[in-house]
Structure formats: C-alpha cells, structure tokens
C-alpha cells in the first residue's frame, strides 16, 4: 500500500478518485506540530533550538497517520506547493520517523502539483522529489521570528502599557500604516479652490463642456482661484468673450490587459468588485482549489491560490487562445501569446498564476452548480484569465483647445471613445479610490469654428484628506512595501480586528485607541522593528533562505542580538517616562490644537493628562484626589475605572479648516451628539452651530459638508413653474424641503446636502396632493 498524505479531507476526497486501489489518501488536518504558546519554545542560547509539540486536536490524526504509515511501502507527501506545505510535509515525516523508527529518507516521496486534476496528480506521483530543506528552513525561520517577537515584546507591552494585548512582527507594521493614515486625516486642513466650466455650443447646436485653463498666458493651477469673489469676477469677465476652436488634436491610445491573478491582486479585486474580505476570498479560493461538487463529480476548479507568479503554462495558454478564437473571434486574439514576467526570486516557489484548471468550464456552465459566492469568485478568475490573453483596447482620444478672440482666455475640452473594445469585451479592472471614468464624447468640431457660450459655471471645491485604507488598498500598500507575503495578508488583517486594534467602518480601516497606543509605543521605543524598510528586508532574507542563499540560523541570530538588546533597554525605562512620551505623541489626537480642551470639564481648574490603570489608558484630572474626574480613551472598555459619564470622546475639537473669512470650523461632540461650529465662543455670544445628522458618520465630515450644514436653511433654486424659492434645511424630524411655506421630508436615499433642484422639484411634485390637502 502506498500512503498519500494531504492537509484536508476535501483535497483527499478529490485526489483519491484519480489514484488506483494501491493508494490510500488521508488528511493531516493542517499542521500536526507547532511551537506551544509558552516561554522556551525557541531557545536562542541553544542555537535557536525549536521545541515542537503535537497539539491535543492533532493527536488523533497523528495516531492514524502513524498507524497507516506502518503498513505502507512508501509515504507520498502531497501537501501544498509552498513553504507552509513543505513544512507540514517535513513535520509529518519527522513524526513518522520518530514513532515508527524509520531511518531512510527514501521512504518519503514529496509530490507537488499546482492544480488538482487527474493529469497533474498522476504526473506528480510519477515524478516525486525529496523534501526541500531550504523551503522548510525558511518557514521555520519565519515561525521563530514571529515567536521571538510575540513572546518577548507582548509581555513587555502588558507591563508598560496595561490593557494592550499583543504585538507582532508584521501586524504591528500594518497597524502603523493605518494609524499614520488616520494622523494625516486628523491633521489635514481643507483648502478651498475653484475652477471654471464653460458650457459651449457648436455650429450644429450641439453642447459640450470645456474647462478654463489659461488667463493672460498664465496657466490656471489648482489654487489659482481660491475664493468665491475671484471666481465670480472671472465669470463676469468671461461673459463678454467670444470663443472659437483654436486647435484639435486626435490620437489613439492602447490599453493592455492586466496579468492573471496572483494572491494579492485577487484579494484586491475581490474586495473592490465583490466586497469580499481577504479572509473570505482565501477561504473560497481554497475550496475551489481543493475540489467542489459540480454534480456527478468533485473537481478542483482553480490552480493553487497562494502564489506570486504571473506565468501560465503553455498548455493553459493554448487552451485560452483556442477559446478566445472560438467564442469571440480572431480579431480579439493577438498574433502571439502574451507572456508575463514573474517577480518571484526563488524559482522553486514560482508557481503559476491563479487560473481555472479547465478554461472550458465557463461561469455560465457552472452557475447552477456552485454556491453564489463560489460562482462570483470563479467568474472573476475566469474572466481575468481570458482577458489577459486578449487584444488591447483601442481608445480614440480628442483634445479640443478653445480660445477667446485675442487669446486672453484659453480652455480645453477632452473626449474619448472606445474604437475597439478588445479585452473589455470580457473584463475591466476596478480602481481603488477613484471615480469611474466616463466615456465622454465630443461632438464634431472644426478648427476656427466659432462657438456660443451657453453657460459659465464657477465650481467650488475643497481639498480632501487621503482616504482611509480599504482591505484592497492596504493589501496593495503592504505589497508595494514588500511587507508580508500573499499567504499572510488575510491573517494580518484578521488579527488586527480580532485584537480590537482596528475596526472596519464603511469597509475602511479605522484605528481604535488601543491600536494607536500600541503604535505610538512601538514607534517610540522599537522604531527600527516597525520601520517599513526593515520589515521588508526581513522578508527578503526569508526569500534568500528559501532559495538556499542564506543560512537560516545566522539570519535569526542577526535579528535576535539587536532585538533582545532593545527589549532589555526598554525594560529599564520607568513607566512614567513611557507615559510622558505616549501622551506627547498623542497630544494632537487627544486634545487637537485647542488648549482649552485639556481643561478638566468637572473642576474647571485642573488639566487632563494620560494615566495608565490595570484596565488600560485613561485621562485624569491633575487636581486628584480633590477632583476624581477620569475619562477612558479606549472605546468599549467595560472594565475601566471610570465614572459613569466618561464615554470615549477623544479629539472633541477637531479643526476641519476655515471659511472664506478665515474663521475656523470645528467638529465637536456635545451631550446630544456631534455638531459643527463656526469659530469660538466669545463672552455670551454663542457661535453658529449645526448638528451632524444621524445619517452621517462624524468621522466622514469634511469642511465642505460642515460649511453646507452651517449655511442651512439654504436656498437651492427657484421652482421653474411657480417662481417660488426652494429651500433645504435640517430640523428635529430630519432633513426637509421648504416650499411655499410648507415642509416636505427628504427620504434617506437622497444626499440632502447635495440635493439637486430637479430632485427637489420631483419631491414637491410627488407630495403635491399632500401639500394641497394641508393648504385646504
């Protein structure tokens, strides 16, 4: 009997049907050994000896493996084709050797395959190799590094920053990215700027829009027009100008398809297009790889999903090109196959890209056989794979340059059309944080053609802070920085959320107070080890180990000598010194720039400062014990030592920017919720305030939104039939339209701050009967 060992029962079930009766396929159910979560599992003083344990959960599976191995003529180790898979195979072999007294390595045969198909399985079994010690060593080095950081840094964190749970080698760097982005957002001050649009009409009475680009030979930069007065003055001057088409430029642009998916690009695209978390994407991809039931049989539908490689096998390319020719026609098929180059350093790990194992299994043919989410992910992979071998998209681009009579004013109008849809026929990649491009066409225009100016529109804008990271953009950033590897991204994001260091709001990462405390501490006292370059450098070292170019224990020793010294140094630091540093670093976040926000709200004479208790960080009054005011800065901490009214309200006086007169606009939080305020209170004169509607997230309030809230009730236009004003406002029952003395509620589906005149008139018309009834 020949024993085949894989990780999962699903994989075992699929493989079993491809092998004859002489083979028995069983599952290890993942790792059978690991480093126990206790001190002494890695011993730096003993040349980094690693003490592995078989977990209670794995015990029964190990017994079955050992029992079957005793009866076997050979053991085929058929775990996944990466470092983790190689390590699982090595651990299985080591346990069998130890339990069954096996001395010869020839008893073990490593079989690796990139897809679970009959052809791939038979080929792998007929061409076994030995275990790759370099891949095993790279995995052991990663595991040792993670253990050494976690089990030396975390206890230090508990002592120096009570309430903080843990720190990790890679997760802490990802957390730093999220926290630093939030710092940027908090410190950001929005600036006003304007541009001028011209609605033009050609000689055939066709309309198009141009944008003013030059005034008196001076190019208009982003901040050339910074206030309403300048914009209106320029608008008035333009009213007397006659424009013509000065020049027309036409060109074609080619767009090439993206490479087939690797792990990180699949996670990003599934997040953008399908709304899947990285964890969900990998769970579904794992099932599609291991095998799913599609009726009469269980088959692996995609190739291995943890890969950095963008190459496709020659057979796969031939099948893809054949399908393109058959289904879409030869005009969509390039003359030669597209070849994509992989950036993977180690050829042993350079797997194929993620693709369907059989391209003829179209999404339509599987729609009724797959679960909904499985179908969605498979369709995404199938379409990307087809598109990567299709012809370019060809765009016709037109730029029309417009000029006034004396060329004092210049404007430009851009248009584009798709001349040939190429790979767009099948697939278009999403773009994170960008508005969808419009396929904007221009009417036919001729050089020197006179134009009529139908409307001149001054457009007000405000600069916006950088967006918070989504799962897609964070994975992309980690990949760009070289931090982590495809197989680790999903777990990194999950750990940060599980430990309450970050939360997801509207699919964007926000740091929790606990996460900010940890980041400030690590940046202050372990800066080298949360530097992006250093962490990326360690990943490169692991790649070097996997390629056999670096000795793994030498790499561990190089890391540990410096890290251990850093641990010992921080252990000597007094907690008061650490608190002082942390408060200074978090000062802006906790108190903004307003010194008054440090004043104790209870006694009015004391000043708030950061303190650490057994349940975490809090703000306390300097007049203690006379004043016992305390305020938790850790949201959701039910075990804190705080008084009853101490809800987490850090950064209560955030400055959003200034209005046109230079008066600061604040976002504040009061007893009835968040509100925006124009300027500070002077004496008994209260500044203008406006509540933030419950439908809006206070963390998303921009200067532009605040100015609109403060301007309510606001006139949005004149009704075209009655000539009466239409106003919008916000009252105790929510947003409303005021028209002819009557009030109409604005439904939640509308963004009431940006309600158009057309939408307002439609709502008035829809409520006409109700209004007439009230009037009667």
Curated annotation (Swiss-Prot):
Subunit and interaction comment: Monomer.
Zinc finger extent (C4-type): 600-627
Gene: topA
GO biological process: DNA topological change
Source species: Rickettsia felis (strain ATCC VR-1525 / URRWXCal2) (Rickettsia azadi)
Active-site residues, Swiss-Prot/TrEMBL: 304 (o-(5'-phospho-dna)-tyrosine intermediate)
Protein name: DNA topoisomerase 1
Domain Topo IA-type catalytic: 132-568
Top-level division of the source organism's lineage: Bacteria
First-level EC class: isomerase
Gene3D superfamilies, per the entry: 3.40.50.140, Bacterial Topoisomerase I, domain 1 (3.30.65.10), Topoisomerase I, domain 2 (1.10.460.10), Topoisomerase I, domain 3 (2.70.20.10), Topoisomerase I, domain 4 (1.10.290.10)
PROSITE patterns: TOPO_IA_1 (PS00396), TOPO_IA_2 (PS52039), TOPRIM (PS50880)
Family indicated by similarity: Belongs to the type IA topoisomerase family.
Taxonomic lineage of the native organism: Bacteria, Pseudomonadati, Pseudomonadota, Alphaproteobacteria, Rickettsiales
Annotated site (Interaction with DNA): 31, 142-143, 146, 158, 306, 499
Keyword annotations: DNA-binding, Isomerase, Magnesium, Metal-binding, Topoisomerase, Zinc, Zinc-finger
